[in-house]
Regions:
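Short acidic-hydrophobic, aromatic-tinged amphipathic segments that line or gate anion-handling sites
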Residues: 46-52, 123-127, 159
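Internal nucleotide-binding/catalytic subdomain
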Residues: 155-296
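A conserved helix-loop-beta module that forms one wall/lid of the active-site cleft
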Residues: 92-155
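ATP-binding N-terminal substructure of ATP-dependent carboxylate-amine bond-forming enzymes
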Residues: 1-96
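Generic C-terminus detector
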Residues: 372-377, 381-434
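Solvent-exposed alpha-helices and their adjacent loops that cap or buttress functional pockets
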Residues: 23, 38-40, 62, 92, ...
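Active-site "cap" helix and flanking loop/linker of ATP-utilizing ligase/carboxylase catalytic domains
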Residues: 249-271, 288-362, 375
Length: 434
């Protein structure tokens, strides 16, 4: 029987999840809360804050949803899945205890240390003076300082010298730029090597990795500018070879799931592994307790299996029997952002080039809406830092990239900013392999 589904969140990731869920014959009516302008072309939107757990659960009960996908980190950390379970509604995503793997950097680093999962050398602190004493004593730069709690993906500072480190500690721990998330910090060694993002499905027993991807965090070309939530992605990641994948499964993926079980907080949902392929082998940079954004926008378009069935098997503990298959092709996503992102930017700029949120007459191209709104007179306008993600799929990465950029050229709004070099690092890696 067709299921009535609610997706919690309101960005490009949620849009990609909704579009993938709609391919399932078992997907009936689909809602998104809070959603956004562009998502409203694909799902009914209800303006409830993703972090308002009580109102969201009340809405889910009242509307008799059969299944809820909690896609955003904050509501997961606040225990939305627990609250839904109490109300008798099955959901995709970890409970509050398991969501700590992302919500607390201290928890995740201590977990890795205890269970021998490869990661950067680190120390944790709650006293700003002691942080600087430690950094001076180590005397190694660059050094990485991370806020313990959630900080919209912006709570990681790479400091090149003592002054930058002191400024960073002040910003996180004293000025409380990220609020209580900065009460504790993790200071860790700077790792080098290619980065790989691997999202995985897990029911707390088995892990089924999705196709690998490569993120582009910096705002500007040549990896310069400030860190953002991500300016584009490609999949698959050429550095993630079958040999690397096997090593990650044995030393990182399965040990992480077993560690969470041993700690009494089994993880069910999407576990995202942020990895660095160092000269000493793969190491974990970070865990996320949900789909990445914009990684989801390249990974799910390549999924050939039924996403709803996969998600339900994660919830029910039957993932071992569930097929998780991806196409052999490639995907590329280019983010169109508001000028000034990630600092100050204007909203409400009219967007041209789209019909019902998509590019007409474009095959193998999907536009995912991150920050858009529809005005009272029906005009699609910008409403965020990251506005749109243009994803193209193709048999090879070169096709997907050129197609994504060609398609992106057809969309315009005032002060549009995009990187022109998404995927170049990956193409270089592919060329070196040949």
């Amino acid at each position: 029987m067709a299921k009535k589904i609610l997706v919690v969140g309101g960005g490009g990731r949620e849009h990609a999840i909704i579009k993938a869920l709609k391919k399932s014959p078992d997907c009936g009516e689909i809602w998104c809360a809070p959603g956004n302008g562009g998502i409203s072309y694909d799902a009914k939107c209800k303006n409830i804050k993703a972090t308002d757990v009580d109102t969201m659960v009340g809405f889910a009960v009242e509307e008799k949803f059969d299944y809820v996908v909690v896609a955003q980190d904050d509501p997961l950390a606040l225990g939305m899945v627990d609250a839904l379970a109490k109300a008798g509604i099955p959901a995709f995503g970890p409970d509050k205890a398991a969501a700590r793997i992302e919500a607390s950097k201290v928890f995740s680093k201590d977990l890795m240390k205890k269970y021998g999962i490869p990661t950067a050398k680190y120390e944790t602190f709650d006293d700003p003076a002691k942080v600087m004493d430690y950094i001076r004593a180590e005397g190694k730069y660059p050094v990485v300082i991370k806020a313990d709690g959630l900080a919209l993906g912006k709570g990681v500072l790479i400091c090149e010298n003592e002054q930058q480190a002191a400024d960073g500690v002040k910003e996180i721990m004293l000025d409380k730029k990220f609020g209580a998330s900065g009460n504790h910090v993790v200071v860790e060694e700077f790792l080098t090597g290619p980065e790989v993002s691997v999202l995985s499905f897990t029911d707390g027993k088995v892990v089924k990795p999705m196709v690998s991807s490569m993120d582009h965090k910096r705002a500007d070309d040549h990896d310069t500018g400030l860190n953002t939530g991500g300016m584009g992605t490609i999949a698959p990641n050429p550095y993630y070879t079958p040999e690397v994948a096997a090593e990650c499964m044995e030393k990182i993926f399965l040990p992480t799931i077993r560690a969470m079980n041993a700690e009494g907080c089994p993880f069910k949902g999407c576990l995202y592994f942020g990895l660095m392929l160092t000269p000493d082998g793969p190491k974990v940079i970070e865990y996320n307790c949900r789909f990445g954004d914009p990684e989801t926008q390249v990974v799910l378009p390549l999924l050939e299996s039924d996403l709803l069935h996969i998600m339900q098997s994660c919830t029910n503990g039957t993932l071992a029997q569930q097929e998780v298959k991806f196409s052999d092709g490639a995907a590329a996503c280019v983010i169109l952002a508001s000028g000034g992102y990630p600092v100050a930017y204007e909203k409400g700029k009219p967007i041209s080039g789209l019909v019902d949120g998509q590019l007409p007459d474009e095959e193998n191209v999907t536009v995912y809406h991150s920050g858009t709104a529809i005005t009272e007179d029906g005009q699609l306008v910008t409403n965020g830092g990251r506005v749109l993600g243009v994803t193209a799929t193709g048999p090879r990465l070169t096709n997907a990239l050129s197609h994504a950029y060609e398609a992106a050229e057809k969309i315009s709004f005032e002060k549009l900013h995009k990187r022109s070099d998404i995927g170049l690092r990956a193409l270089k890696a592919l060329a070196e392999k040949q």
